[in-house]
Amino acid sequence: MGAPARARQHRAAIARPAGQGSREGASPARPAQSDDQPAGPTGADAIYRKLFDSFDRDKDGKISQWEVLSRLQRSGLLPDDPRIQHALTGLRGVDGAPKQISFQQFKNLARHNSSLIQRAVEGNLAVPDFPALTSDIDRMYRELVPVRSGAVADYIPQLRRVDPEQLAVAVCTVDGQRFSAGDAQVAFCLQSVSKTVSYCLALDEHGTDAVHRHVGREPSGQSFNELALNPKGLPHNPMVNAGAIMTTSLVRPDLDIADRFDQVAATWQRLAGGRRAGFNNAVYLSERQTADRNFALGYSMRESGAFRPGVDLQQTLEFYVQACSIEVDAEMLAIAAASLANAGVCPLTEDPVFSATTVQSCLSLMSSCGMYDFSGEFAFTIGLPAKSGVSGALMLVIPGLMGICIWSPRLDEHGNSVRGIEFCRKLVAAYNVHVFDSLTTGRGRTAKRDPRRKKNQTQIEEVVALTWAASQGDLNEVRALVASGVEPGTADYDGRTALHLAAAEGQLDVVRYLLACGTDPQPVDRWGGTPLSDAESNGHTDVAALLRQVLQPAPEAAAV
């Protein structure tokens, strides 16, 4: 292939939209039917055939359950995912053993959720490179195990007896990709994490204005159980004890206390993808016996007229303590956090538990008030909505991406999990998930990784941008890319560099700049072509002369 043909081919490749025949192009986030794909059954058959062929490694027209299962698990979709359970069940024989299935059988099974399976196979879920994320999460988990500072909560007798060595980390993305490490199926009480759902339930039932006539939305700057109200005689926000008692009083006040509790527990179950939330009666009784401060807060709010008329204070406090005593495990809380990250829709069931505006309000207050009197520091260093509880639970929400639960009973002086805070620090150090990371990661290279991007996507885009700018003679863009950290001599799959393209197109200023950067003047592409041969073949004599001058040995060297 001659140099002009190579140059034309390369320009066509870098101009082609990603996903349309390019070897490394990034596919769109959601599969879309292309213009040339027939509509109706024929188009659907093409999608099913593409999926089937990706599993059929030995090309014998049959695939096994294990081929499908391993691919889905690698992408983060687990066998108990309700969206794919029907398909996985159909892949087993009558005796439960895996079976070989044909294309037609696969099509009958996959049609129950073909879009999800297709996105998983193509790497187009919320976190495309899920194995890399899970590897990092597992490493962070192992680094947390030796951390033993802090102490378990001792003002609630039952919590005092919890094993302080327990540790769990669980992750769930907005597409339902899941991973967990450690004691992720050990149940623990929600405690203050329950305040998030009580607030959301009150908002969905009464609306923002009505709820905030009874509770403020400013950080208190004080301890979570401080005997203090704002200047209007209202609790400062729904994330402190006084505020949570208030929002609890607003949840279905027309029902008796048993039905009100059932609604709260059922809501947690919906958020967690249908997994049943438990109740720790021992913790409830233990906390009820030591609830003098909460009673004092309740009487103080009643005296200031903060409650709606007719509130039964005794029943409200009982209801509040019951909500705190609901039990979940780390895997459930991660799914619940992912539901909040997904605008109130559970990723596993697609159940719209809360409205998007309700979740927006909740995440706003979690950002400013969710970590007790450490909330400001957490917002500054971590920059994500979170809610902690004295049981050692920490629910972290990355809006639009994932939810994370860290559970470790040892607490710091603020009442937050020591290991939970340390995990969050490690996470934001490794990934650009801080709310303001876009201000820094978009300007030059960074050690942080973007979990939303495909493996090698950044490097691919850098090569495309540099070679395209060089071919067009856009010297300012080439300079900007090099200044941001892009290696000027980087090559594409064919071994073509920016210098090849600039020489082939006669872009003398770009060639001169790349050479001044120390770029190799004679890189060889897969066809044996060099920048000099490209310039000569395309008749760019000025560029060819410059390259010969650079390649020609100095007179002293020639004499030797």
Locations of regions flagged by a protein language model:
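Active-site-adjacent helix/loop patches that line small-molecule binding or acyl-intermediate pockets
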Residues: 120-142, 149, 202-323, 339
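Structured C-terminal helix/loop/strand segments within mature extracytoplasmic catalytic/sensor domains
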Residues: 59, 68, 342-461, 465-468, ...
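Amphipathic regulatory helices of Ca2+-sensor modules
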Residues: 62-79, 102-114
